[in-house]
Design a protein with these regions (language model features):
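Acidic/proline- and glycine-rich, intrinsically disordered low-complexity segments
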Residues: 102-126, 142
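A short, aliphatic-rich beta-strand micro-motif
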Residues: 112, 152-160
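GAF sensory/regulatory domain recognition
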Residues: 69-73, 81-112, 132
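Amphipathic coiled-coil signal-transmission "stalk" helices
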Residues: 13, 26, 33-36, 40, ...
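Allosteric cytosolic regulatory segments
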Residues: 18-25, 188-195
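Signal-transducing coupling segments at domain and membrane junctions
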Residues: 2-3, 90-92, 99-105, 129-153, ...
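Amphipathic alpha-helical coiled-coil segments that mediate homodimerization
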Residues: 44-50, 54, 60-79, 83, ...
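Flexible loop/coil segments at beta-strand boundaries within sensory signal-transduction domains
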Residues: 4-5, 87, 160-165, 174-178
Length: 219
């Protein structure tokens, strides 16, 4: 506490205060390390869950996309996550997890007038600190739905198979709170996992079709 009289601290008292300061630093560092470990374990758990679903669902992409959306929202500390897949000239909503209703159309034209569309067209991540403040000028197509939903911070990453964009994964927050570099890196990993899963299902189906053809030819 504070002293009202002027009397210097003794060397022992100074040493004791230094010890308390060191202990505080150690405690803070311990909390940081514990949180990092918890985050790391959550990420590993999410990855192993996704791999498990891929293994259990080799011919059906839906359970995999649902799991990836749920994991992305949870691990990246977002209010929701959605995955859209390119289907002809539209981006079709394929999976959504989170309490925010999706007022945006289930199918969005592939152009720069929506966040997901722009991420796909430009083949790069789009990170917007406050979507609500720029939607009128930047993303007119989804202005009405953005205002209805109250979306603030948004991050979209394209799903790239080799050099071809095949869809997007997007996470949102209902407050202005940009995603950290770590969360951005994690969403890219989830995007990669989605691409692997989609490719896996495609190959499995192809293999099944070839086996059927082979069986018919042998009969």
């Amino acid at each position: 506490g504070r002293r009202t009289e002027v009397r210097p601290f003794t060397p022992t008292q100074i040493k004791l205060l230094e010890t308390f300061a060191d202990q505080a630093v150690i405690a803070i560092e311990n909390v940081r390390l514990f949180n990092e470990l918890k985050e790391s374990l959550e990420q590993q758990t999410a990855t192993s869950e996704i791999l498990g679903v891929i293994a259990r669902s080799p011919t059906d992409i839906q359970p995999v996309l649902d799991t990836i959306a749920e994991s992305a929202a949870h691990v990246c500390n977002a209010n929701d996550a959605s995955i859209r897949l390119a289907d002809g000239n539209v981006l079709r909503l394929a999976a959504h997890h989170g309490p925010i209703p999706m007022f945006a159309a289930a199918e969005l034209p592939i152009d720069r007038d929506s966040v997901a569309g722009r991420a796909l067209v430009e083949r790069q991540l789009i990170h917007i600190e406050d979507l609500l403040s720029v939607t009128e000028t930047e993303f007119p197509r989804t202005q009405a739905s953005t205002e209805q939903e109250g979306t603030r911070t948004v991050l979209a990453v394209p799903l790239m198979r080799e050099d071809v964009p095949i869809g997007t994964i997007m996470i949102r927050r209902m407050e202005v709170r940009p995603f950290s570099d770590k969360q951005i890196a994690l969403l890219k990993i989830f995007a990669d996992q989605a691409v692997i899963a989609i490719e896996n299902v495609r190959l499995f189906k192809e293999l099944g079709e070839r086996n059927s053809e082979l069986r018919e030819a042998l009969e």
